[in-house]
Amino acid sequence: MPCYHKLKAWQLCSGEVVFAERGAIARELELPCGQCIGCRLKRSLSWTIRNVHESQVHPLSMFVTLTYGDDGYNPSLVYRDFQLFMKRLRRSVGPCRFFAVGEYGESDELNRYVRTFSGLDTTSRRPHFHALIYGQYFSDRAQIGSVDGKPLWRSPRLEALWKHGHSSFGDVTFQSAAYCSRYCCDKVNGERALDHYKRVDVATGELVDVVPEMAHMSLRPAIGVPWLARYGADIVCARDGVVLNGKTYALPRFYDRVVESLVPDLHSDKEFDRYILSEKFAADLTPERMAAREIVAKARISTLQRKL
């Protein structure tokens, strides 16, 4: 996905990048804004690819959903609750890696889900966590339903570990990884965030601030690095991209940085090849075409329903 609102910048002879013309300028740059729908979708896709690759190096993995019940209900996400859940999980089943996001239910999709499988009466944008857990799986599972044809399970062991409400789990797939990664598209920044992250506390009637959507993950090593160490050199040399679900995607930017640090000459060659290839698509990068593509991207993302 391209950036639809690139920022003009300048690189000084010292190597510093500035956003106002000053000093000894070496060259002019166009940098991604990081906030438009194109940048958010690109970041989301990168996390999806890295999480799918992470799952491929573990024999066991699961997609866990943790919601809050009505007892002691807090309208805001509390990351400490998830941290303690992970500590209990590791004490119970052993080492594991994870990629977790905390977010708030969109429209009534989460509310319908919670009412269906837990019986809770929900009327607000309920905070919840999704986590891709690598290296462990609950064998005491019992099916409680399905989402998009994929079975959804409950587990007494999982319920004992998450003490704040309803819990369930399914399999890690491209779709579930993408579902987690789309938190990038939900987070609101800037002036809009002041009103967006306010909720009414149903217990007191007060207007309270809630924390924004968040993501936390295993860092040592980073998500996707075990896969990259095993297959990365062959993939980069062969096609400069990755294939998932029969479709070829560009390498995540993080993979590029790792390859650059390990094999700088190979990275330089690939960068030059990409520059030459980009010349073929120059006609599709005019301001008019970019404006049209942004409209299409926003329309496409609006059709993606969140069902968990």
Model-predicted regions and their roles:
Residues 1-18, 246-308:
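Long non-globular sequence segments
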Residues 1-52, 274:
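DNA replication initiation on ssDNA origins
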Residues 31-34, 58-63, 95-96, 164, ...:
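Sequence-level motif detector for i,i+2 pairs with an aromatic at +2
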Residues 36-39, 43, 68-71, 153-160:
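Short, charged, low-hydrophobicity "junction" segments
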Residues 37, 65, 99-102, 168-170, ...:
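Residues in well-ordered beta-strands of folded domains
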Residues 42-123:
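Signature for HUH/AEP ssDNA processing cores
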Residues 105-111, 122-127, 133-272:
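Conserved His + Asp/Glu catalytic blocks
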